[in-house]
Amino acid sequence: MTADQAIVIDNGSYQVKFGLASEVRPRVALNALAKDKYGVTHLSNQVQNIKDISSVVFRRPHELGQLTSWELESCIWDYCLYNPDEFGIDWQSLENRHVVLSETCMTLPELSKNTDQVLFEEYEVDSLYKAPTAAYIPFYTTNENIKTISGKSDHGELDIEEKIEAGKEYNDFSLVIDSGFNCTWVIPIVKGVPYYKAVKKLDVGGRFLNGLLKETISFRHYNVMDESILVNNIKEQCLYVDPVSYFEAFKAKGKNKIDFVLPDFQTSFQGYVRDPKTALPDNAQILTLTDERFSVPEAFFHPEISQSLKPGIIETVLESIYMLPELLRPLMASNIVCMGGNFNLPGFTDRLVSELQRQLPTDWVCRAKISSGDKSLTGWTAMAKFAHTDAYKKARVTKEDYFEHGLDWTTKERFGYQNWV
């Protein structure tokens, strides 16, 4: 690796995605520390080696979406960056490297300062650029692996070639919906900058779905309140969002039932979806899921089913749109970009576009762009594209700038959101 290549790190609250800007796909590591029921601690991807996944307790560097524990985060980063046996890279250190980093939207200034201090003084990077993941998305929407879903198309899914003015490296306007582990952000991007006055946050994310799924299964089937890994596996393999409506899914719940084989710690340690053509092992325990498959993700649209008296994702997006200048509103509604691991749920984007189209004025068209691959990698891909632009080279903060102007300057003048509010 040459020293002038940027190292791109999408530091999410669930996973760390990292790699060189020149690479096609990032390496992925769990952003957590786990302790099993025998008291043994497992760092990041070592969790995959746990044989008995019951009663595993997690500790994460992020709390309420904010990076609060650099003591733990630095251990996870060291595991990721200096681990050639697992990730096939040997960077030795970040000293004199260029780093492109993501951070939570609306990061508290003091916590943002901690990040700057750790990167420049502990890791001794040569330069740093950091921003909310959504701020990189305008550089991603020219990717050939994007599909566009329209609320007014008979076919629903369209292949639209993006046309950008000559000499421009990004799209001017995007309404980014980032649905991750901790929450869901709705962030309008105008001329490459988040329009913070219209940024909205919905406290429903992957962690929320896990908790609701735990309660639902524990009430109807088995007690799984201490089975965090198992419930997360069930969520990723079994849940979906009906692309039309909850009522359509409920009418067809008998046809869409699924059997999940619980781990027996002999033939399976994680559990799996049963193939009807395959014989079951002796003494196998089956968890049959019917309406749980779609009623749990329905909390995105109707949080009241989980006793949460908050607006759903449709109301949150509409509120963000109507806080924009009037001329931008229809433009943003037709330039939605969906990203984050929750959009891996089948049917989520289709349902979102369908519901939004019903709520918007009739002469508006709702369109959403989404990756055809793993949606949780969208942010890293956008960051890698940004790292090749001239805008990045002009905007990054060098080590000399940091030590000349100080910590407060980097937060207030370069990376903080306060100047844009």
From Swiss-Prot:
GO cellular component: cytoplasm; cytoskeleton; nuclear periphery; Swr1 complex
Database matches in CDD domains: ASKHA_NBD_Arp6
Gene3D superfamilies to which the protein is assigned, alphabetical: 3.30.420.40, Actin, Chain A, domain 4
Protein name: Actin-like protein ARP6
Localization terms from the record: Cytoplasm; Cytoplasm, Cytoskeleton; Nucleus
Complex and partners: Component of the SWR1 chromatin remodeling complex.
Keywords: Activator, Chromatin regulator, Cytoplasm, Cytoskeleton, Nucleus, Transcription, Transcription regulation
Function of the protein: Component of the SWR1 complex which mediates the ATP-dependent exchange of histone H2A for the H2A variant HZT1 leading to transcriptional regulation of selected genes by chromatin remodeling. Involved in chromosome stability.
SMART domains referenced in this protein's UniProt entry, alphabetically: ACTIN
Record PANTHER family: ACTIN (PTHR11937)
Native source organism of the sequence: Candida glabrata (strain ATCC 2001 / BCRC 20586 / JCM 3761 / NBRC 0622 / NRRL Y-65 / CBS 138)
Gene Ontology terms, MF aspect: nucleosome binding
Short name of one Pfam family: Actin
Keyword Nucleus: yes
Family membership noted in the UniProt record: Belongs to the actin family. ARP6 subfamily.
Keyword Nucleus attached: yes
